[in-house]
Amino acid sequence: MGRLVEAIIASILLSLCFTITKSAPKSALITNLPGFNGTFPSKHYAGYVAIDKHRNKNLWYYFVESERNASVDPVVLWLNGGPGCSSMDGFVYEHGPFNFEPKKKNSHLLHLNPYSWSKVSNIIYLDSPVGVGFSYSNDNADYTTDDTKTASDTHTFLLEWFKMFPEFQSNPFFISGESYAGIYVPTLAAEVVKGHKNVTKPVINFKGYLVGNGVTDEVFDGNALVPFTHGMGLISDELYEETKLVCNGTYYTGGQSGVSKECAGKLKTVSDTVNLLNLYNILEPCYHGTSLSALDIEFLPKSLLTLGKTEKPMAVRKRMFGRAWPLGAVVRPGIVPSWSQLLAGFGVPCIDDTVATKWLNDPAVRKAVHAKEEKAIGNWELCSSNLEYRHDTGSMIEYHRNLTLSGFRALIFSGDHDMCVPYTGSEAWTKAMGYKVVDEWRPWMSNNQVAGFTQGYANNLTFLTIKGAGHTVPEYKPRESLDFYSRFLAGEKI
């Protein structure tokens, strides 16, 4: 009897594997990648999904099948932030199947990444919204967008994608992302849940989501920096106590009445003290100059918060994302690592995106990944200079509350050396949800070492820090990231 059962199971698995080979669109299969000399550890696909055929509005994706068991492993959507930054950032610099190394004599650019998230999951890297990366529309009006439209368009993409890859419809599905994806992820999750209630087909087997160093709430995020700088030993006890006193412990007011002149002065002193540091990881050197910090928002003119609709967003190349801003503000995409950059347009410091930019603009690479030619849609930028983006959804706290109370699992993780979206803000808002603590603050382990700290709450909410990591956690701590990612997807204790 046992052998009969084993034979039946083997037959089912073989059938599933055959289905994967048969069902996935052959035209999307990637057969080679310039810079890589070897055999892919799993199948890769890329191409466009039309989310509005009439307008020729298309989102581009890169899909990596799991290296373990694609037929049953979770499908995970990855979204980088910005707003307006390509998710190929995650592919190239964080947790993709390859490590990109500067080309040396007689060597190749791409090498297999032992800590790729495709070791344990199928993963979709999506360029969203339209106008980002290789995604495009024939109607330039589509490059003016907002949180609500982005969530709706990405949900449409998912429905169409699962029709193209029907063999994955029964797999557990998770949404993940970092930085401004702290907005993208919960708003998209809410759309997916709404689709469930409306019995939208195909039904997406949504189980939960992960957010790394994510923008969440204007006030919580805005108040996070001063405690972070003090806790990290970046400002003196005296300056911290003086700032705390004159600001009454509140360093950002959400654009209501502002702060006092005395408070603004102390905040500027804090800003001046830390502004030579790498915003995205205070342990790392800063390569491209410096930037003022987020604290400057309190004493800069509010009139600088918006761009006029006729003003083209700045064509600057940058890598990171980050801080929330007042509801309704029109944003220069990709320029949100600090309020001062948002308002004054300084560009993003300390970051080098040369490898991704050169590789993805190589005509042979674009052809290999089924992306439009440069003459058709322009050059690939890590963060788009084509968008006008409006933040229109406000705080994400109620989104998280609704999702977790509905039974969906949530992991909020933070690199503890990120000064862009400090862990202090994420720790504060997860605690403010008011859920019962079911797993008290403790270290979590990776490779027999303390990798960070975690606290678990009722209703499937977990907060996690990663020791020594910056804004883009898997970039700095790849082994540890694969560990917590694997455990979360499997429903195991981290």
From Swiss-Prot:
PROSITE patterns: CARBOXYPEPT_SER_HIS, CARBOXYPEPT_SER_SER. Its main location: secreted. Disulfide bonds join 85-383, 247-263, 286-350. The active site is at 179, 418, 471. Probable carboxypeptidase. One of its GO terms (biological process) is proteolysis. It comes from the Eukaryota. Glycans are attached at residues 37, 69, 198, 248, 402, 460. It is found in: Secreted. Belongs to the peptidase S10 family. It is an enzyme of class 3 (hydrolase). Pfam families: Peptidase_S10 (PF00450). Expressed in flowers and siliques. The gene is SCPL21. The lineage of its organism: Eukaryota, Viridiplantae, Streptophyta, Embryophyta, Tracheophyta. Keywords: Carboxypeptidase, Disulfide bond, Glycoprotein, Hydrolase, Protease, Secreted, Signal. It comes from Arabidopsis thaliana (Mouse-ear cress). This is Serine carboxypeptidase-like 21. One of its GO terms (molecular function) is serine-type carboxypeptidase activity. One of its GO terms (cellular component) is extracellular region. Its EC number is 3.4.16.-.
